[in-house]
């Protein structure tokens, strides 16, 4: 979900039913005007800004600006365009395109297609969500044990949401994934494509199948990797992500035991170390002396229990990391070893320094609070958290799914796009390719199977490995995705690749 996938170290880094009244039709999209990018960007890309309605029920009302980038195909006669979304919510499509390395599997799309990256509404170089960083830097526990703690959490995130509303304006009310899908439909028309070709990673998978449900006749080739299931109730979402995180953590522990390069190789009880440090951080946050509250990677001066556990999930995203922006398993082991010695800098949470946020966290919560069901009160949340700890005794369910259940209880915009089964309109699309690794710390293979069952014209392939998404790893799974995108070759449903 909101966990940045890096294609290179250049960057630090789904409403399934349309429902409700039929929206007024927008006028045919005006063509997008591509032009030069800023001088600090590569010469082989073009940039554009494009205005879309904030509220599609008022197509002639207030507009918001989307920023986009295009990397031209190597072919003199390209087949068209492929849109790339790296997930989040809140992650930049522009940065994803810029970070693709020559010779990598993602770069091979350029043999036959232009590659387009868009910063979705509220994100990055598009008109951004703005919030008060001072409020966001206050850390209030979301694992609550009594009514007073619950009330404190609700009040904190109510104030955070109100700050976002005050600084952002009406855009905050229209951040749900249906509106993101409508934006992509406007851009498809503006670019002049008859079909929407799309690579969606992580949360991008939710954008993809939401678009396919809303505009089935416009779908071209669509590959979705690291599947998010936005069709089941909140308890299912929290428990599935908690379980896949916990399972992946145990894979990491086994890897350390079998790999002499792991900094914790000689530790015979890594699970015990994690439990001890989490308990200590709950009582007294662990210092993070290497963190500064400024610069390119500002982070908190200490690490509480939830920061510590969230940092572990972040370290499991890529088995081979790209530090300092994205740690891998080796770095995670080093961070845990250092934390055991009193320095948890490597696991510290982001420190917010401005009204706009480079991590995408502001936009992520703005989307999540409109897309995902919230806890109905203290008793409901306490039951969910108690149940989750059974599935995840080490990580305690500290995941993005839980953050939406907790932080959104009193958010300043209503739930607009709650989970529900995919509508049957999606049966009218061409073949859609779904991809998941077996041990993804943020996107459960259980989610992928659920979505496969709801999209008749889909095939689900697996990577026999760990980590969040597969496309950027340049293995056989990436090659299979490209064979589908470039040639229309669909692997047999259920195929498993080793890389």
Feature names for model-found ranges:
Residues 327-332, 340-344:
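Glycine-rich, aromatic-lined ligand/substrate-binding cores of catalytic
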